[in-house]
């Protein structure tokens, strides 16, 4: 790549199209110095966002676009490999999800090799949050959000939390490297009104450790309120009875009650403490669902503090608690770090009994499996092949059988290119190449590559002979031996 490119695109530059009489735009030394001092990412954004008005000169637009590309890629300073890395990194950032974009930005990756090392070592920030602001999602580090350090009185008011977050965003100085990286992810927020603060949703928090048992981001608010009540006993008074309103009368009659706002629970161990959600849901009196009424300025006690006589995990709506027609709250329990969920009667939840066959007492997890198994006792084979009239217990067996007629063998071995009609046959064939023998006899510790061979072998220990000849009543251990024996009877009959 030519090393003598300048901002003015001198003789022989890429913008000198043949036969063009239009004078070239020559940048002054001051402009060149100012251009070189600017951040390359700024030129990158200017290059990608460049647009040409319809009435402008296309030649001038081409020169301007070429100049912006030169200021971004800087072929006079970078090698071909570095420019290639810049282009690949750009497409990577466009096509990858937001989590990986943050990962690249935070670590300041500049080359594909560094990016590959970063992804292999999985050097990710401890945690970040997805912020839903005015209908759009943005990513911010929790250290910048700074919600975990907010006092309980602030966390009780969602508007104060959102205004504190907005002020922390506005205080980021554009000169610092960290603030500049965050501004690439989150657009500048000039000022959030109080109404916008109420509608601000921090609806999703990502735990980048990948631990499936890690606490989820919707379980801490109620615990914080409970701790605040312990410090301030005045807050633990029960919720006053609300007067009967037309909304409650309409709820009893089965009509649509007034839409209510709720503050959902958040995880007690999640660092980003406050998650505020407004839900506008319609409910009918027949379905029996209702939401907790909660004011953004006041914390509402949980069900256990309202009435200690009520079993844990049960709650009734605020208002007329004895009304039979009024909707009730259906609590949803999720296991957390504290241990299993307690039940009203102090009894542990019992797993549903498995579905057992009434003939052979074999158990199944799903009823559909039991239904298919019962056909082996009744002899029902409802799925029939149109070509050979052979019948099968389930449709998957019929589809596999039809490959015998069509000659289809969709499963191919990667080593010897041999093809098979059944996937299980392919898996057993692959063990020939790998030497794997995963099936072990529980009696003599002998190993086998196929489960069928193990079952036949274990009959030598148990003495089982499931195949019995209907002619001579002789029993056999293996199906192949039994079929060969049946041929002897047919040959004798034919003679």
From Swiss-Prot:
Primary site of residence: nucleus
Location of region: Disordered: 1-40, 150-183, 227-347
CDD domains registered for this protein in UniProt: SCAN
Pfam family, one: zf-met
Gene3D superfamilies: Classic Zinc Finger (3.30.160.60), DNA breaking-rejoining enzymes (1.10.4020.10)
BP GO terms, sorted: regulation of transcription by RNA polymerase II
Basic and acidic residues composition-biased segments: 250-262
Location of the protein in the cell: Nucleus
Keywords: DNA-binding, Metal-binding, Nucleus, Repeat, Transcription, Transcription regulation, Zinc, Zinc-finger
Polar residues bias locations: 17-34, 161-173, 292-310
GO molecular function, one term: RNA polymerase II cis-regulatory region sequence-specific DNA binding
One cellular-component annotation, GO: nucleus
Domain annotation SCAN box: ranges: 44-126
PROSITE patterns: SCAN_BOX, ZINC_FINGER_C2H2_1, ZINC_FINGER_C2H2_2
Superkingdom: Eukaryota
Zinc fingers (C2H2-type) by residue: 355-377, 383-405, 411-433, 439-461, 467-489
Disulfide bond residue pairs: none
Its job: May be involved in transcriptional regulation.
Protein name: Zinc finger and SCAN domain-containing protein 5B
Protein source organism: Homo sapiens
Protein encoded by which gene: ZSCAN5B
